[in-house]
Amino acid sequence: MTTDVRVLRQDDWNLWYDTLIRAFGGVAEASEERELWQTLTECDRSIGVWDGDACVGTAGAFSFRVTVPGGASVPAAGITMVSVAATHRRRGVLTAMMRRQLDDIRSWGEPLAVLTASEPAIYGRFGYGIGTHQLTADVDTSRVRLSVPPGTDDVRLRYAVPADVLDVCEAVYARLVPGRPGMPARRPGWDRLMVLDPESRRDGASPLQCVVAERDGETVGYTRFRVKPDWEPSGPKGTVVLQDLEALDPAAHAALWRFLFDIDLTSHLNARNRPLDEAWLHLVSDIRRCNLRKRDSLHVRLVDVGAALEARTYQAPVDVVFEVEDAFCPWNEGRWRLTGDGKGATCVRTRDSVDLALSVRDLGAAYLGGVSLVSLGAAGRVRELRPGALTEATSAFSSAIAPWLPHGF
């Protein structure tokens, strides 16, 4: 098979995107959804694989900046729209695209690549590690109550048309981004994704609704959600389907969650993609009836090990030599000495004795502070060659706030 990997031309976008849609089952998107993704696609950072006139592979890379421990916003390639035509599976198309992408990202000077995976087993061989997780909750709100903090009743809630309050909601989101690793700063246009509301997204629920939280005339939080009505002989059994919720303080946070718990004619709340450490978990009367499930979210790839490790800060002083294995990006292979603390870090090549040996995949998993190096060591994925080095590095890499990706891309 002879194929050609090339940068996407704007004139080829429709064919390229049709290839992607077919690979994901072939169900056409609403026109407004397709138009938005066309606007967001960065063609000069996207590639297609062509077999003659047929597009048989797709991959893109958004220009993101992602928060890392310490609060810095670090350039990261947001890998997206990856697909291979079913007619060309197991012929090296995906590997060719991953090769081209990582070479390009390195040339752009971006130390990180991140993605969400339709199938998590795919990307480990290319050096991606699972760096964040998310919670889904199915709460029986007829049986669970919230104990709210002082000041909750001082928060005013009001309904608003989602598109009409987009700017104030985005301002709340932007204030939160530096405080949580894994959160991307949303570039212009990405806010529209948050209020996209085609019928195909509703699954029998209402159009998207929005409630904003205010105090003294200032917006301090918001939630966007749908309501899915249902009735049984015993009465209403509707479900609130939460899309997103952000708040600037405990009272606003509690006020919004209490509102969602108490919506008339509903008895369940489905909350998807929430952080592992979210405060509402400590407000509920019965955690078991929240039916929590955890799953992978953001996969992290260190494209430039030295630059990536220097970009974040560390919870405790650290001075450790890593032996990094990276067969797919051999420029990362070898020994790196990381010296850092809460103020900054340096990471340079060294010939000193190795303290810890691990793959770039596992270094990526630990990078945002949500995966413990000790736990990876217990799984045999990190080898400790200097006694005490694993505990030292684990303390340094940890994050007081769980890393989280609030939305897909």
UniProtKB/Swiss-Prot annotation:
InterPro entries: Acetyltransf_17 (IPR041380), Acetyltransferase_Eis (IPR051554), Acyl_CoA_acyltransferase (IPR016181), Eis_dom (IPR025559), GNAT_dom (IPR000182), NAcTrfase_Eis (IPR022902), SCP2_sterol-bd_dom_sf (IPR036527). Residues 3-162 form the N-acetyltransferase domain. Acetyl-CoA binds at V82, S83, V84, R90, R91, G92, V93, L94, T95, S118, E119. GO terms for biological process: aminoglycoside antibiotic catabolic process. NCBIfam families: PRK01346.1-4. Homohexamer; trimer of dimers. Belongs to the acetyltransferase Eis family. This is Uncharacterized N-acetyltransferase SAV_5428. It comes from Streptomyces avermitilis (strain ATCC 31267 / DSM 46492 / JCM 5070 / NBRC 14893 / NCIMB 12804 / NRRL 8165 / MA-4680). The lineage of its organism: Bacteria, Bacillati, Actinomycetota, Actinomycetes, Kitasatosporales.
